[in-house]
Amino acid sequence: HFQNYSSTKEGPLYSISLWGKRIPKGVNRGFILSTTKNGVSFFLQNIPKIQGNTTNRIGSFSTSXGXKKTFAYPHETXNTMLFPLLILLLFTLFIGXXXISFDNGGADNGIGGLTILSKWLTPSINFTQESSNSSINSYEFFTNAIYSVSLAIFGLFIAYIFYGSSYSFFQNLDLQNSFYKESPFSYFFDKIKKNIYSWSYNRGYIDIFYTR
């Protein structure tokens, strides 16, 4: 499945950004986040320009009408993956609070032999305990949740920097360009960002696990 971005304008004055949309050549490529009249484009300085016949580099596909159209990048899955992920999200949110208690599990009820995942399924907050113990468990629960949630939010923030949508309301804040200043360390940090992006794009972390 590919998202349709038909190349109606052929020529060297246009290049394809990370999101597959055509961006005019006259964009300031010194910034990681470059602002154009139509929106924001990410990491344009490393995007190769596609000149002339784009059929050899991307591929040409025929539609039912018989007209050839060029597609720039694969389209993300729609509701086929969205609904299963939402179902998994519900289990992820509530399994820690509701969970399944194995305190009474033993030879009497036959649950004792099925406790492989008992530690994962044991509720973090036991509502049957006294109020003092419940408050302590609640404090531990939220303390442990802060670290994991903070790490997840930090990962989302990094992903937004690299892959954030150009139609987001954050584009008016001009965050990255406001932090970017000409300094002796700007080139060094920009080089690090490019290496991290290239490493993650080429799935270097997967190669490390497979080579072990």
UniProtKB/Swiss-Prot annotation:
Chief location of this protein within or outside the cell: plastid
Reaction it catalyzes: a plastoquinone + NADH + (n+1) H(+)(in) = a plastoquinol + NAD(+) + n H(+)(out); a plastoquinone + NADPH + (n+1) H(+)(in) = a plastoquinol + NADP(+) + n H(+)(out)
Enzyme class name: translocase
UniProt EC number: 7.1.1.-
Summary of subunit composition and partner proteins: NDH is composed of at least 16 different subunits, 5 of which are encoded in the nucleus.
Function noted in UniProt: NDH shuttles electrons from NAD(P)H:plastoquinone, via FMN and iron-sulfur (Fe-S) centers, to quinones in the photosynthetic chain and possibly in a chloroplast respiratory chain. The immediate electron acceptor for the enzyme in this species is believed to be plastoquinone. Couples the redox reaction to proton translocation, and thus conserves the redox energy in a proton gradient.
Name this polypeptide is given: NAD(P)H-quinone oxidoreductase subunit 5, chloroplastic
Species: Avena fatua (Wild oats)
The gene coding this protein: ndhF
